[in-house]
């Protein structure tokens, strides 16, 4: 009778496999333990920081932890703890001397103390600069620096963007833009496009055939805007649509073919392959900017549709149609910004900045007055979040006097 006892060779194999499994488990556990000690916690903390809502303390920390600067245009240093303290002390002295406002043109109706609190926390903090960046702190009413004129006009910009584009969004969720929404603790050279756009869009040339006001393709180069009469790099074609978007058939819930704009792939013979490529990459840029996929705005079985109340269970995101309408409104916003940027006090640049502290070249546009400006794009505010982390929701604005210094009613747009 044959023995059922395993042979020595079989036992050796079993023991070897068991030891191997134990060693593999211990090695893997040790690796992840060491990884967590060295990198894991830091990465988790970085992720939490990246996903945290903006706070005025973020910008104030940038100011107080930075080295001083040496202005050459007559302004005083605005960075560092000393500059911050000097600005705070000067502001406190000013509101004691002038409890009623002097030379206030936008935040009319607020007291000097209210304006001072708002400016210190939500303007200085938003831009990551001390009071001296815009003000002669010996005379806060003075308009001697162009940065103050620009800031005043930017308050008008916040008001008008909220009024014209934000509070009347389809399915508005109560979010407003504020200074920090664009600035995120930096006064200028704001990045409008981001690493994914810069690194992922291929360096190929395409022919842009824009649509006219009737939704018909313009094929004659002589009839096109000068910037796109010849083939251009795909990145520049994307920029053209970000800053030159129109709606030629406004949305009507009773018309399934409405809600069509510059990026529509028309049914009359279709568009060229170049136009499809441009369209796809504009969508990619928006998706990268918001940190979302196609179904955030689209029904994947019918990309053209707007179904405000979709039936059935085959729609991943039942609010997608509202998001699609919002995205169209945001393209109208970036177009409006490019058209109106100079009149809101933006300071032109003699040339596109390069080197340390500059944004990518795509963040600078030569506008209608022939000058170069740092113009916002989708990424400027969103930075990978479908709701910008530096926006502010009405639920977070206290009622009554306390809310006035968080987001003044004068710039909420309603």
From Swiss-Prot:
One GO location term (cellular component): plasma membrane light-harvesting complex
This protein's UniProt keywords: Electron transport, Heme, Iron, Metal-binding, Periplasm, Photosynthesis, Signal, Transport
InterPro entries: Cyt554Puf2C, Multihaem_cyt_PRC_cyt_su-like, Multihaem_cyt_sf, Photosyn_RC_cyt_c-su
Binding site for heme 1: 110, 131, 134-135
Binding residues for heme 4: 378, 381-382
Highest taxon in the source lineage: Bacteria
Residues reported to bind heme 2: 154, 179, 182-183
SUPFAM superfamilies with a match to the protein in the record: Multiheme cytochromes
PTM entry text: Binds 4 heme groups per subunit.
Binding site for heme 3: 283, 294, 297-298
Molecular function terms, GO-annotated: electron transfer activity; heme binding; iron ion binding
Signal peptide from the UniProt entry: 1-24
Location in the cell: Periplasm
Cytoplasm found in the keyword field: no
GO biological process, one term: photosynthesis, light reaction
Role according to the record: Serves as the immediate electron donor to the oxidized BChl2 (bacteriochlorophyll dimer) that is oxidized in the first step of light-induced charge separation. Can also oxidize low-potential substrates.
Protein name: Cytochrome c-554
Species of origin: Chloroflexus aurantiacus (strain ATCC 29366 / DSM 635 / J-10-fl)
Lineage: Bacteria, Bacillati, Chloroflexota, Chloroflexia, Chloroflexales
Gene: puf2C
């Amino acid at each position: 009778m044959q023995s059922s006892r395993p042979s020595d060779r079989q036992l050796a194999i079993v023991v070897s496999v068991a030891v191997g499994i134990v060693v593999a488990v211990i090695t893997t556990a040790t690796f992840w333990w060491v990884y967590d000690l060295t990198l894991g916690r830091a990465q988790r903390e970085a992720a939490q920081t990246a996903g945290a809502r903006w706070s005025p303390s973020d910008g104030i920390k940038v100011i107080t932890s930075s080295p001083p600067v040496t202005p050459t245009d007559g302004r005083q240093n605005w960075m560092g703890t000393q500059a911050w303290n000097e600005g705070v002390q000067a502001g406190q002295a000013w509101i004691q001397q002038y409890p009623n406002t002097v030379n206030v043109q936008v935040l009319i109706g607020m007291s000097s103390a209210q304006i001072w609190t708002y400016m210190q926390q939500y303007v200085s903090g938003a831009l990551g600069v001390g009071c001296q960046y815009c003000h002669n702190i010996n005379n806060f009413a003075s308009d001697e620096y162009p940065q103050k004129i620009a800031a005043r006009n930017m308050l008008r910009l916040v008001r008008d963007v909220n009024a014209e584009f934000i509070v009347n969004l389809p399915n508005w969720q109560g979010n407003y833009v504020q200074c920090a929404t664009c600035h995120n603790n930096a006064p200028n050279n704001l990045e409008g496009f981001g690493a994914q756009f810069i690194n992922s869009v291929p360096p190929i040339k395409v022919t842009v055939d824009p649509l006219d006001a009737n939704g018909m393709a313009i094929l004659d180069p002589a009839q096109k805007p000068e910037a796109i009469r010849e083939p251009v790099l795909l990145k520049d074609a994307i920029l053209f649509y970000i800053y030159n978007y129109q709606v030629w058939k406004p949305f009507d819930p009773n018309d399934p073919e409405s809600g069509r704009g510059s990026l529509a792939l028309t049914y009359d013979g279709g568009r060229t392959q170049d136009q499809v490529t441009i369209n796809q990459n504009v969508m990619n840029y928006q998706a990268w900017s918001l940190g979302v996929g196609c179904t955030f705005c689209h029904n994947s079985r019918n990309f053209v549709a707007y179904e405000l109340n979709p039936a059935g269970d085959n729609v991943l995101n039942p609010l997608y149609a509202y998001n699609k309408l919002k995205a169209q409104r945001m393209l109208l916003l970036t177009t409006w910004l490019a058209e109106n940027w100079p009149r809101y006090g933006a300071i032109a640049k003699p040339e596109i900045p390069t080197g340390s502290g500059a944004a990518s070249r795509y963040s600078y546009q030569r506008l209608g007055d022939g000058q170069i400006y740092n113009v916002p794009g989708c990424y400027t505010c969103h930075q990978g979040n479908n709701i910008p982390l530096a926006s502010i929701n009405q639920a977070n604005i206290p009622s009554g006097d306390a809310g006035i210094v968080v987001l003044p009613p004068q710039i909420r747009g309603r």
